[in-house]
């Protein structure tokens, strides 16, 4: 997957660690959708 910004990482993509992974077919086991707003499918962060 491609790294993505989790809500817990900070407000912007630049200067923050991207701890999420963008999955096209939902989140793998042990992960959850990390975006509390907007489209959440595929934006996965570790629980």
Swiss-Prot record:
It is found in: Secreted; Nematocyst. Its main location: secreted. It comes from the Eukaryota. Disulfide bonds join 4-44, 6-34, 27-45. One of its GO terms (cellular component) is nematocyst. One of its GO terms (biological process) is regulation of signal transduction. Binds specifically to voltage-gated sodium channels (Nav), thereby delaying their inactivation. This toxin is active on a variety of voltage-gated sodium channels (Nav1.1/SCN1A, Nav1.2/SCN2A, Nav1.3/SCN3A, Nav1.4/SCN4A, Nav1.5/SCN5A and Nav1.6/SCN8A). Belongs to the sea anemone sodium channel inhibitory toxin family. Type I subfamily. This is Delta-actitoxin-Axm1e. It comes from Anthopleura xanthogrammica (Giant green sea anemone).
